[in-house]
Amino acid sequence: VLGFQRDDILDYVFNNIKIKPEIAESIVENEDLYLNNATYKLSDTLYEMTGYKNIFALSGSDANEGAIKLASAYQKIIGQNKRTKIVCFENSYHGSTFLNYNMGDSLFEDPLYTMKPYNEVIRLKRDFDPSSVNWDEVMCIMVETCSYGQQLRPNSQDFWDKITQIQHGGVVLILDDIFIGGGKTGTFVGWRNLPVMPDIFTMGKAITAGFFPLSATMYGPKIAEVLP
């Protein structure tokens, strides 16, 4: 998106991460977290491009963990405390932290890092039968825009129809757009051409073209309206 090893970008980043007197003073006095203008500008730009508010993080794993925490907070705020389950799909990859790794598939598993049982995760096949799940217990469903684990083969219209129906039943829909976002599908947001509108979606390397660690958990009006 931005090119490779551009000196102007590297110089801008370097100049902005050098600690400034006001930042040092804020840290010493334990005042509120200091945010520079670039943070606000990027947040505003992403909102203008997507219509979603955001929470910044460092990695895709962080963004996906944040998405699940947002979904959990949303369900609790609206009084749906029984919704604790997380639904994901086979041949998926959502990160390397404990929860996200358990949501992935054995394709990414090795003898030194085996899956641990996590009772809140339900992993389904792509041709799943919706009646096989008690959706009243499900907090959120996480889907990759286009899964690396299934060789980037797009999901079927029938698959997305099921997902939309489940979303309308009160389950928070999270789209993991980290791998495929950033223009790979013809739009900056990878899911724009899909027949679906997520409540939350996540972005990663595409934001900075890999120049430095940054990701974002993007949340729409449904979530924003209930957050304190």
Regions found by a protein language model. Name each.
Residues 1-228:
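Conserved N-terminal phosphate-binding loop of PLP-dependent enzymes in the Aspartate aminotransferase
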